[in-house]
């Protein structure tokens, strides 16, 4: 096997996770570290190490034994639950990657806030309006590859309703946002990696709310690639293996994704997607993410697991993407029978 990268966990949802796996696998052989690889992941793998990434100690031992027989080039994960484990294993193998200390502090909101405050980083609680800096760091050079603007749903859950990436987003030139991102990276001591830095736009300027020290979810890497040409997944793989990432923009467009949540809490009785959605100009994809018969929770209290569908669009501007998303939404129909009336 030719110098693979180890991926801790394939992810739980093909609809969200397969894109990133395909991009990593296009650049380097991938060995999945997971108890059992999902069927959708198998075509993209060069190998499988049977170990539960959630069992940190046992997984580390299994990886060390594997690395004694194969030259492992890097360790990656796209799963929040395995970020600390991936950092620990990379450190044990002497490979590039997020430090254990950084991974641990990003997983603890109180510790992260204290660290950032001590590093003169302006912080705030999560909330609208929200923007995330898709940041690539290499040896002191901090590059914001793209900005993701997120429309949040109703409280208290405030789940994302839509993400939008625009190659010409005016905030890319906002010096206060760039300063907040730079200070965040320095406070965390990150010298190499891909970060998803969440910020809240306030009257006092951008305020950092959270930091994800790995690739973002929700198909944001897809949006970034469609809008700018920058491949965040391959950049993350390059950084994890000690190589130079290519973050040169090759596109000047916009891309957006929208999620449908149940209108009521109850049993999903009907869910249908017309194939005409794929024929809408600007449509990238539209996928059902729920099954009839399942119990679902309405938007204000929903989780990502309650989403009914996702659909993505590409256009010259965010407004063009919005128009396409609206047209695509007409091809989705759903009926939820509230629990109070369900038979």
Where are these regions (language model features)?
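Internal nucleotide-binding/catalytic subdomain
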Residues: 123-206, 213
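Peripheral (often C-terminal) accessory segments that flank ATP-dependent C-N-forming ligase machineries
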Residues: 6, 30, 237-343
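Glycine-/Pro-rich loop/turn segments that contact NAD(P) or position catalytic residues
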Residues: 104-121
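Short, flexible turn/loop "capping" segments at secondary-structure junctions
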Residues: 42-43, 157-158, 301-306
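Active-site "cap" helix and flanking loop/linker of ATP-utilizing ligase/carboxylase catalytic domains
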Residues: 176-197, 203, 212-270
